[in-house]
Amino acid sequence: MQYNEKLDAELKALEGDMIETLQRWIRVPSVRAERSAENAPFGADVRRALDTAMADLKRLGMEPRDVDGYCCDTEIGEGDEVIAVLSHLDVVPEGDGWDHDPYGAEIIDGRMIGRGTSDDKGPGVAAVFAMKAILNAGIPLRRRCRLILGCDEECGMQDLEYYEQKIGLPDRGFSPDANFPLINTEKGGLKLALHAALDDARLIEIASGTRVNVVPNQAVSVLAGDWREAAADAFDVDDEDCALESELVDGNTRLTVTGVSAHASVPEKGKNAAKMLVHVLAKLGIGGAPIALLDEAAGRESAGEDLGIAGSDKVSGALTINLGLLFAREGKIDVTFDCRYPVFFNPETIGETVQRRLAPAGYALEPIKPSVPHHVPESSELVSKLMDVYNTITGESAKPFAIGGGTYARHLKEGVAYGMMFPGELELEHQANESIDVANFVKAARIYAYAIVALCA
């Protein structure tokens, strides 16, 4: 890789605009909702985020194309071959526990705070301004670089499925939606939804979780009668980040367990409030076999050992499982797990094992629809060039690695995830107080600019 003084000068000149643009994007609470119009399949706020992004692309001299509200795209460069850069505008719900406005985009002590700063509006804006700097620097590209900004990455990627059917996806590219240096392997993804009858009149309700791909940081249960003292005795978690609160309301006890949210691909980084609540209920003897077995089989770890599905391979590492959604009411309990499984594992076997483990308590598993694992060899031209850019700019000698998260990259025949979180950096995606280091945001844009030049020039 060779440095380009003109490109670096353009990147420097664009820094202020880049930061202000990200703040503008963050201030739109683009959480998926029901279709609100023909061109708003994911709700009005997501549509507003798309309009905001397209307006900025036009302002910067690019020509965005609206793909029926599912996403937008824009290109720079010439030639028949296309390299894709895939980012997304939708975010997970903000949840509780924020110290600042989750959509305020405040900059405090060098960090911009807000939902979407790291996942994935920040990386998207960095890619936009990388492309703008290349345009301003007048660098000719023999391949086209196509930026695609999606609107449904967090809830199943229907946006890219629609795009692929209507437009068609390039074969190669990267998604700035994870970590540097580079991720060439993504585990398979599996949603395991189970249901069982619940025969205990004392258990009025359980509610925990907003999305299956988030470790729930709050869990609430309502019990008939006064269970305040017994519940306090049953809560055996010694952690300042976790708590149990109880109150008597109209003769019933409302229990609220607080934990710490995290991305479901790294459940060990969170403290699962749903599992803590299940453990309390099991110790109280409430909920019968469905609660007792759930606590025994899934309430104590996140590697799948107690469910009988634990394991790993050399390519992608260990299986993880997150109890992401837990609801009970009117004699029924609904449990949904997010499982990230290694490349060489069979998802059907995982589902069958979980069903067998929980069947004694009456649980039935819905049909599974796995997201298959994804792997790009380290020896590929794509990986080699992107790693060269990263290592040259950072001075490191880093190697690619695997993650449990699923990014847009898996939709490409040869796609990888590439930043924008740096090694050792504070990672707060899907958590309260999500934020990014502004200096690293600027640094990532520089890496993306040189990466696009390396792949397309």
What is the predicted role of each segment?
Residues 10-17, 21-28, 52, 56-60, ...:
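Generic non-transmembrane alpha-helical segments
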Residues 154, 160-342:
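Midchain, well-structured core segments that form catalytic/ion-binding scaffolds
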